């Protein structure tokens, strides 16, 4: 069996680039908060940045070519009369943005913006947020060892149901891209041997050869010997993202990391990594790879070494104290709240469920006849092993089928949802977090969790784009 996690040739910006402006948050964040992305664009200005080579999902499909022609101010920047926004990216059609991304990628590769920072190795990541210090190791996974079909018991598995309709637009972005930037975070169930790791503090270069012998807490062990590694970057992250440092894991240390994860793979019972963040991004990478295999353009030998066979990801330890599972809330807009709540109550009864006053699911809204915020919460008392989010999402999906004007978005953070309820006069639905210790057993038993069940940290604690790798020949 080949290893599913491997070293990579990793690209980073050259030493003259402002790393704080280079690194922006995952494209699937703040999808209802245009002000966030406007502020990012203003802050980055003309500096080299990952903002120029990713497609924030808030803009995906929001403007047609005809709208662009009508709203353009003549300088390639859209004037939005209602919001007063004037941003370059808000004015682009999807096709224009994708073409811009691909062109900018090629420019960064040829003008010296990017350099190979790590050869056949990994990057140890130290991310400091309000939740603490979260560690990770960036490397390549073999997409042949991953599938988003819950029936496939692969080494790398999705944690939530994949919405197939979300994949084609993302394939269009990736299929002609020269490079990839990961915001995918995979989780490994690797209990930490704290006593052994604490004994490694102040380790020397010679201690690196012991990595392969580590049976518990591989990432934490590498972090304990970080002073023996070459530092790659050390920067604050914009928009309250905290601080990040990266270290090159090369040579013998990289070989030992590969062996340590290979040993973990051989003893994991067929399930090594669970997708913590970026389920749909990884599903897109898988789809692109399958399309390449089906294209007939490459021989079997060429496919074995094709760069698109792999995806650059960050591996994090499920047992890290700084890795917190947060709930993902729902926001309904253009909704008749009274009608929706009646529908919800009727469905609860129809399913033979019972509810009492509680906090498992909390609805927050502004009544049409008032300005004050109202909220009501319930617990579902006889749900058995079903999660509240599973019951809720099933009912919402059914409601949306017959109420085409109602829109749903998925929101990270209590304060963000409170603000959006006031701003949109919609209905916010607050959920509780799940116990992360149950994740692997739940996926192993049931396939996937309901979509948008949990989030790793708050929105500003998500992965910021930093490292890159080539995916096209």
Q: Which residues fall in each region the model found?
A:
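Class I SAM-dependent methyltransferase SAM-binding "motif I" and its flanking Rossmann-like core
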Residues: 298-336
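A generic local secondary-structure boundary/capping motif
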Residues: 171-176, 265, 272, 301-302
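Charged substrate- and nucleic-acid-binding regions of tRNA-handling and nucleotidyl-transfer enzymes
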Residues: 390-470
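Active-site beta-strand/loop microenvironment that shapes enzyme catalytic pockets
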Residues: 253-296
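Non-transmembrane, aqueous-exposed alpha-helical and coiled segments at domain scale
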Residues: 288-289, 324-348, 352, 357, ...
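Portal/gating segments that form or line small-molecule/metal binding sites
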Residues: 235-257
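N-terminal extension/subdomain marker
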Residues: 1-236, 434-448, 460-461, 465-470
């Amino acid at each position: 069996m080949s290893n599913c996690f491997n070293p990579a040739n990793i690209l980073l910006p050259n030493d003259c680039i402002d790393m704080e402006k280079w690194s922006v948050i995952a494209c699937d964040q703040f999808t209802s908060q245009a002000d966030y992305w406007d502020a990012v664009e203003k802050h980055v200005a003309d500096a080299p940045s990952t903002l120029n080579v990713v497609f924030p999902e808030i803009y995906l499909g929001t403007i047609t070519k005809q709208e662009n022609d009508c709203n353009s101010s003549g300088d390639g920047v859209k004037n939005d009369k209602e919001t007063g926004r004037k941003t370059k990216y808000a004015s682009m059609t999807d096709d224009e943005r994708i073409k811009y991304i691909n062109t900018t990628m090629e420019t960064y590769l040829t003008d010296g913006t990017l350099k190979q920072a790590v050869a056949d190795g990994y990057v140890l990541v130290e991310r400091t947020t309000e939740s603490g210090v979260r560690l990770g190791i960036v490397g390549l996974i073999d997409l042949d060892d991953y599938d988003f079909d819950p029936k496939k018991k692969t080494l790398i598995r999705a944690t939530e149901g994949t919405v197939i309709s979300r994949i084609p637009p993302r394939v269009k972005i990736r299929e002609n891209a020269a490079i990839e930037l990961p915001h995918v975070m995979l989780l490994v169930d690797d209990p930490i041997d704290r006593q052994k790791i604490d004994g490694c503090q102040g380790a020397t270069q010679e201690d690196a050869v012991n990595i392969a012998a580590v049976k518990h807490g591989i990432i934490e062990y590498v972090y304990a010997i970080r002073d023996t590694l070459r530092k790659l970057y050390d920067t604050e992250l914009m928009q309250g993202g905290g601080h990040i440092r990266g270290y090159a894991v090369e040579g013998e240390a990289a070989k030992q990391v590969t062996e340590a994860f290979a040993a973990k793979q051989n003893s994991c019972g067929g399930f090594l990594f669970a997708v913590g963040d970026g389920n749909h991004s990884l599903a897109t990478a898988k789809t692109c790879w399958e399309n390449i295999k089906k294209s007939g353009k490459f021989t079997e030998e060429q496919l074995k070494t094709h760069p698109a066979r792999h995806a650059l990801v960050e591996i994090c330890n499920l047992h890290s104290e700084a890795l917190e599972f947060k709930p993902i809330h729902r926001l309904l807009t253009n909704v008749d709240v009274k009608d929706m709540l009646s529908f919800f109550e009727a469905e609860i009864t129809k399913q033979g469920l019972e509810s009492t006053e509680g906090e498992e699911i909390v609805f927050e809204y502004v009544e049409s006849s008032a300005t004050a915020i109202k909220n009501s919460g319930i617990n579902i008392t006889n749900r058995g092993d079903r999660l509240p989010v599973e019951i809720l999402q099933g009912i919402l999906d059914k409601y949306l089928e017959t109420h085409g004007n109602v829109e749903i978005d998925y929101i990270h953070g209590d304060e963000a949802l409170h603000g959006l309820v006031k701003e949109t006069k919609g209905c916010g639905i607050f959920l509780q977090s799940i116990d992360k210790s149950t994740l692997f057993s739940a996926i192993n038993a049931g396939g996937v969790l309901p979509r948008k069940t949990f989030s790793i940290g708050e929105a500003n604690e998500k992965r910021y784009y930093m490292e890159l790798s080539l995916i096209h020949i």
